[in-house]
Amino acid sequence: TVVEATSGNTGIALAMVCAAKGYPFVATMVETFSVERRKLMKALGAKVILTPAADKATGMVQKAEQLAEKNGWFLARQFESEANPEYHRNTTAAEILRDFAGHGLDYFISGYGTGGTITGVGEVLKVARPNIKIIGTEPSGAALLGGQPWQPHKIQGWTPDFIPKVMNREVIDQVIPVDDVVARDTSLALARE
């Protein structure tokens, strides 16, 4: 059995892989996370265990760790595993560099959940394009990188109540807070275009 704490994105991917390989998969999620993501994981054969909102993302991680320890399950550890940013170094960053070959690339802007994307992509882009600026974004009410206390926010998959171990903060040149309502309204406007 594979177990992982997830806001849904990695959980959906793990549910697909586990279904294809015939492995049982258990996802732990905070009860306030997307019902749609839960349904999709369940449709792929996953068992979804909800943790109390008051326990935040730390609670879902602790629940996954407890289940792995108690049952001898494999814990994927997306917030800690070096495989996470390594994947983005080898694929996401390589794709960006291919797409921008012969063109300027001044900024890479990314939010963070596990920190894998901004770390892996940022590290490669800094070497390939030394003048690039890596911009991290996080909900304004949960601006941990900005030195603020964490508060619940509405941007799914972004910014748990801890700074992930896998994240290389040194690669980030600037952090920009994003308002929940503005983020929602902007995504809806872009979807309509």
Residue ranges and their predicted role:
Residues 1-193:
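PLP-dependent amino-acid enzyme catalytic core
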